[in-house]
Each structure stands twice: as C-alpha cells, then as structure tokens.
C-alpha cells in the first residue's frame, strides 16, 4: 500500500484560543502544548455572559467554547480543533492523528466514540442535572442512568487497556488520549467509579508535560498566578 505523502506542516501566523476552565477547553490547550505551538489565550468562561458578547458572537453564532482562531480560520468543537491542529502542524514525532488511512480511521473511531458516547450522552447529562440543575432541573433518574451508561461504554476502554498498551492506540500518544483522558478526569470528579486499569492509564497520560502546561493555560483568570 502506498504511504501518504509527508507534507511540511504550515507555519501559520497568529493563533488565539478562546475559552478556559472546562473539560472541553483543556483539550485544545493540551493539543497546542503537545505540538509545541505558541498561542494567545482569551480567558472566556462559559455561562457568565462572556460568550454572548458582540465580539464573541461575531466569531461564532454558536456562542460556545473552545474556539480557535488561526489567521483567518475560525474553528469550534474541541475534537475538530485537536484534529485540525495535528493535521496542520503535526510533525512525525508529535502528530496527534496518524497519516496512514487505517491508523487515522482507528484514531477517529476512538475520538468519535468518546465525544458521542462518553461526553455528550453520559457526562454532559450528569452536568446538566448536577452542576447546572438550577438551569435544567434536578433529574436523579437521568443522572443514575447516565452513570450506568458511562460505565457500560467504558468496558471497551477496559478491554483495550487490558492488553497493557501505554496509550489507547498502543505506544503512541494521540488525539484519542486527549479526549478520553479529559472524560475520565471529568467522571472521577463526579465520583463515577472506573476500573483500576483506567485510573492507571489516566495517571500515565496526565503525567505528560503537555498536560501540566495545558492545566495552567486552562485555569480561569482568578486561579492564575498573579491573577
């Protein structure tokens, strides 16, 4: 099979990442740090009016974070941002999404699984009726069902990690690890129990220097040093 042509990554100009403090915004920060890219941070927070300003709405009518500006390109959705950054700036040693067709398909399969089954269908339901119950109302049965569903979906992760890979796709860190780890951390914060192998995996992934830098960049303004 012919291998995809290796292209030189675009150098790019000014990069601005809007959004801090959430499990979704940290994904974009993490990818930027893993790729060694410089960028400016706009410490916009969710649900405090920051995303409803005329300035931000002009960038995205969705009024959601994270949002990446890369020169004249504006892109939202954390998984799309991570994939774009890898495709545009990734080098052989730090690319987050493989170039080969099968490797890319497997990575994106994991990414789409995490975003749809773990994030949107499970964890965000818990958030809506937990942290945001003053908006969406309390729904204990929905929260319980979401917790059970999350744990059920995590079985495929447990089986994969049962073969003792360092990362979810083996020995290489990818975008799938960024998305999966942020969901595991999110679940643990909600006191959702997960397998020991999952906890150990998450410790390995979050021990990366790029994660520590992302945590600092993702901190809300009041939590920043000197802030």
What are these regions (language model features)?
Residues 114-207:
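GST-like fold's C-terminal all-alpha helical module
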Residues 86, 183-184, 215:
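Active-site-flanking alpha-helical
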Residues 49, 222-223:
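Generic structural signal for helix capping and beta-alpha/helix-loop junctions
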Residues 2-141:
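GST-like domain detector, emphasizing the conserved glutathione-binding G-site
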Residues 45, 175, 218-219:
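Short, solvent-exposed turn/loop segments enriched in Gly/Ser/Thr/Pro and often Arg
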Residues 80, 197, 210:
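Residue-level recognition of oxygen-bearing side chains
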